[in-house]
Amino acid sequence: MKVLFGGDNRIFLPNDTRMIGTFIEGMDELIPNANGNLQYVHFKYEGQQLLKVYTLKHLYADDVKIVTATPNVYWMTEGTEKTDIQIGDVVRFNTYDKGWKVTDITDTVEDAYSIEFANGSRSIIVEGFELLIKNEV
């Protein structure tokens, strides 16, 4: 399964923050999943791609986050995984998360990087968020 993320997204590692573009193409990279376990992934530059920009407003704090990704990323909404989130949906990134309301979804064309899983894992941390990724069947 391949998921594209915009080139301005960062991946939070346990002791570091790295731009996706700093990963070496074709090399195995270890990144943490939602449980804090490390998983192997491959990164590849995919050129200019049409991506979605999701603007999220925290339900209880004065905080706004922007995530740029392809629409095949699965989000957790009220305990259900879905890809077709809409404006007004509330997404959560872990069990203790109070929730983020989707306030805007727009299209953008950006430099994009693909993330391919070497071991079939289903989650990745991008911009501090857990994004679920399903394997193609």
Task: Describe the residue ranges of each PLM region.
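Autoprocessing domains of the Hint superfamily
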Residues: 1-137
